[in-house]
Amino acid sequence: RLQTNPLQQIQVALGFETVGRGHADNEAIKLLASILGGTMSSRLFIEVRERRGLCYTVRAAVDSYDDVGTFVIRAGLDASRLKLAMDVIVKEVKKIAAHGVTKEELAMAKDHVRGGLMLRLEDSSERAEFFGRQSLFFNEVIGPEDRLKQFDAVTVADVARVAKQILDMKAMSIAAIGPYKNAKQLLAQFPTL
């Protein structure tokens, strides 16, 4: 989907379908998102923003619904840099799908999840939401430590498996807002998938 905007900045999203809420692979998928684009030490942030200065922002995130989920990579950049940025992003996606992640990357992602959850739970409204969502969506409540144990149980092999399953370039969807007049003009900026 393309929405035209006369500004020279473009917002682009690359989307992949994932599993629904409550699926056993959810923790591995969330850790994959953290490693690929969830922090300032993530692969995409380092390669696309820090090393090459191609975008203002780049990140990966997961949203889970009852029966399906989305794994989305978002980038905001100058339209003149789109082709080069997409080359780098697609290369990193293919690399993580083909070769998985390292033990060090997984350990850092688990630390990020642990730190983020513990920080969130210091706020009483966030704490209420944490427990309320579980009660509403799963009809059971898992405490923070047990929730973190689910993330701790994820292995390098688990992340490699979900990366290979989810990050299929042929099944990727693209959405963008930018100065392109038509989808063909936009798609010419993407590497051959």
Labelled PLM ranges:
Residues H23-A24, R81-A85, A183-Q185:
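Short, conserved charged micro-motifs
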